[in-house]
């Protein structure tokens, strides 16, 4: 009888190992899968404005009265700003736009940018670090919009953001290259709560989206 117990014990051990493996697999089963896909283009333009190593543009909103933001959703102080590209390849097609990326200042509930009770100190890196640590301004946020005034929602993908696209033109200084000028708006927007008077600052990163 003893010799016959060896294959039986081996078979039992294999069955137990298979059962334990199945249990472990079930315990670590996913609830779903996120597939992430994208496209990288060899199209290259140089950001001309904002210039400098960090390509930081300062948009100065006008000084306004709290009364201009009387109720939730009111906008005031719409201010245009540009992003200009140069040295684009002559093959660049129409439809270049900016993607305003999510970050620490994004309010996912409102789709606007949180404003902070802090003044800009002309040092982009220091200001960004200070903003994150500063107190959030009450009753007001900053909105990015297209030229026609339609809101560009923050915290969504590029398709949902629906930022206005712009077409390249031949660079008169170099006919072998193209340039692109992108135009958007920034403004104050009223959110729930009482507005506290004082300086406010925020920031948002951007990337260029090519056709």
Functional labels for PLM-detected ranges:
Residues 7-17:
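Sec-dependent signal peptide recognition
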């Amino acid at each position: 009888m003893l010799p016959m117990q060896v294959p039986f014990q081996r078979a039992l051990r294999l069955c137990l190992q298979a059962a334990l493996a199945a249990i472990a697999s079930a315990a670590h089963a996913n609830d779903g899968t996120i597939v992430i896909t994208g496209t990288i283009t060899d199209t290259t333009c140089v950001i001309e404005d904002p210039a400098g190593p960090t390509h930081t543009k300062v948009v100065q909103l006008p000084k306004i009265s709290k009364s201009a933001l009387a109720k939730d959703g009111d906008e005031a102080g719409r201010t245009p700003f540009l992003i200009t590209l140069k040295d684009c390849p002559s093959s660049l097609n129409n439809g270049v736009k900016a993607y305003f990326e999510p970050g620490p200042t994004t309010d996912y509930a409102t789709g606007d940018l949180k404003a902070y009770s802090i003044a800009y100190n002309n040092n982009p890196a220091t200001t960004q670090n200070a903003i994150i640590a500063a107190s959030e301004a009450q009753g007001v946020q900053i909105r990015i919009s297209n030229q026609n005034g339609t809101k560009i929602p923050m915290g969504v993908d590029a398709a949902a953001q629906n930022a206005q696209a712009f077409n390249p033109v031949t660079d008169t200084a170099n006919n072998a290259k193209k340039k692109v000028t992108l135009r958007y708006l920034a403004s104050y927007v009223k959110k729930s709560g009482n507005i506290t008077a004082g300086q406010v600052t925020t920031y948002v990163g951007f990337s260029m989206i090519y056709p």
